[in-house]
Amino acid sequence: MVNSLTFTLVVVCLVRSCDGVAAVSSDMIDSTNNRISRNMIRRVLQETATANDDVKKLSTSTKVDSKLNQEIKTKPDQLVKAEKNSSKIGAWLKRMNVISSKRDKFFILATILLFPIAAYMVASR
C-alpha cells in the first residue's frame, strides 16, 4: 500500500514537472530559423535609444521631485479589516481569502486535510 502510494506521488510529480517544461519550451521562439532584416535591427536600435532617452529624462525628473521616489502601498479594504482582528489564525485565513485564488485555496485545504491521513497511514505500517 505504501509502495503504491509512493509510486503514485512520484508519477504525479513527474507529470506536473514535465507539463511545466513542455509549456515553457512551446512558448519559446526558434530564433535559428528566422532571418533578421537590417530594417528590423535599425528599428530595435532606435527603440532602445528612445527608451534610454526616456529613462534619462525620468531619472532627472525624479531627482527634482523626491515624492516620486516614495513607494505607494495600498491594500484592499478587506485585507485591512482582516489584519485588524485579534485572532492570528482567523486573520491569516481572511488574508488568504482576499489574496489567494480558488485554486490556491483548494490546494491549501487539501494539504491540511490529507497530511494527517498520510501521516496516519505511514505510522500504522
Curated annotation (Swiss-Prot):
Q: How does it sit in the membrane?
A: Single-pass membrane protein
Glycan-modified residues: N85
Q: Give TM regions.
A: 106-123
- At which positions is motif RxLR-dEER? 43-73
Instruction: Say where the protein is mainly found.
Output: secreted
UniProt keyword Transmembrane helix present: yes
**Alphabetized UniProt keyword annotations:** Glycoprotein, Host endoplasmic reticulum, Host membrane, Membrane, Secreted, Signal, Transmembrane, Transmembrane helix, Virulence
Q: Does the keyword Secreted apply?
A: yes
GO cellular component term of the entry, any: membrane
Q: What subcellular locations does the record give?
A: Secreted; Host endoplasmic reticulum membrane
Q: What is this protein called?
A: Secreted RxLR effector protein RXLR-C13
